[in-house]
Amino acid sequence: MTDEERYRTALLDWLACANAGAAEPAARAAREAGDGLLERVTAAGAAGHVLDYDDTYLPGLAHLSAPVAPAALLLAAELGLDVAAVLAAYCAGFEATGALARAGHPALYERGWHPTAVCGTVGSAVAGARLLALDPAQTDSACAIALVRAGGLRASFGSDATLPLYRSTASAR
C-alpha cells in the first residue's frame, strides 16, 4: 500500500466513524450548537470520535484523524477546493499531529494531558494553513495561536460529552 493509499484509507475510516457516530447524543448536541463553520467542524469531530472506533496512533497515544479530518474536509468545502487539496491538507495535519504526539510521548500523557486534543489542535492548524495557502510565517503564527488555545486534560476520560468534545474542538481551533 502506498502512502497516499494509507492516507485515503485513514480518511475513509474516519468518515465511516463519523457516519456511525452521527446519531449519538454527544454528536447531536454538538450539531445543535449552530451551523457556522466552527460549529460544523466541532459537530463532525464529535461524531467521528464519539464511538471511539477511530484511528489510534500508539507511538504518540493519539487519534490523528479525529481533529484533522473534520477541519480539512469542512474548510476545503467552505473554500470550494477539490479532493486533492483535502487529501494534501489532511496528510500535512495528520503528520504534524503524529510528530508532536510522538515527541511528547509519554510525558504529555503522564502529566495529565490528552495528546489528541493538544497535538491535534496544531495539526488542524497545519491542515488549515495548507488549504489557505499560508506562507511559512503565517503557518507558524497559526500553529502558535492553536497551541495557545490547546487543551485536553485526561481527567475527562469516561465522560460521554467531554471526551468527544476535546477531539472535536481541536478541529475547530
Predicted regions and their residues:
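N-terminal core-entry segment
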Residues: M1-R173
